Amino acid sequence: MKKLLLLASVLAWVSGVFAEEKPKLIVGVVISHFYPEWMDMYANELSDNGLKRIMKQGARVNMNYNYFYTQTGVDHASIYTGMLPTEHGIVSRAWYDRLRRKRQYSTQSDRYTEIGDQQADSIKSLSPDYLQTMSLGSAMKWNNPMSRVFSIAMNGDEAVLSGGSSADMAIWFSEKTGKWVSSSYYRSELPEWLRMYNTWVESDHFVNKGWMMLSDEDKSAARIRLTNHFY
């Protein structure tokens, strides 16, 4: 599974599991198609307070999961529950429901509607109803009901399954509107701060900007080593 889970609070949470002071913030970041060796390869290009800090002060552990079929959503559910697809229930992005005789997507729900710029009862939304086990966010809520859990991603499946069943809110990017949306599973409307952000960020705000590399093309290409990869 070519994904890397980075915990920004790794110093407090991993290196000091039994520390007296509990961390007030845990940030989980999943980067799809990210090879761990790239962190060493591009170490000189990284900022001191970003990934390089995690490399120097964090902990690296083997988090391979014993399953072959990797997909968006399946992997995120495995990462944040610590379980295999056969255990957490998200075995694929979609499967055939024999009882209802229809194709069922892992997060698609007829019980909830989308909330956001095009909020309407006719727009069906997403929920973690098919997630069958406790996630990291749910465990935090169980340990401390005052904990707040938010999940944000470009893809709805990623946001919903990373947040888990007890998340305060999952937010994802709508390709139709170019704005951030959510589901009525969490609340009836978007929070004020997100509505203001959606007003400021138009869909062409980033589209009209060019992709500027931090280093020239030749320098970056020279650092990419494919000899140790399977392809």
Language model features by range: what are they?
Residues 40-88, 148-150:
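Short, structured active-site-proximal loop/turn typified by the sulfatase FGly-forming signature C/S-X-P-X-R
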Residues 35-41, 64-66, 121-127:
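Second-shell loop/turn segments in exported
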Residues 32-36, 60-61, 67-72, 85-86, ...:
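Solvent-exposed loop/turn segments at secondary-structure junctions
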Residues 23-35, 54, 79, 140:
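Beta-strand elements within well-structured catalytic alpha/beta cores of enzymes
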Residues 24-25, 49, 74, 131-138:
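A structural signal for well-ordered alpha-helical segments within the folded catalytic domains
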Residues 17-21:
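Boundary at the C-terminal end of the N-terminal hydrophobic targeting segment
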Residues 84, 92-231:
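His/Asp/Glu-rich, glycine-adjacent segments
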Residues 4-13:
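Sec-dependent N-terminal signal peptides
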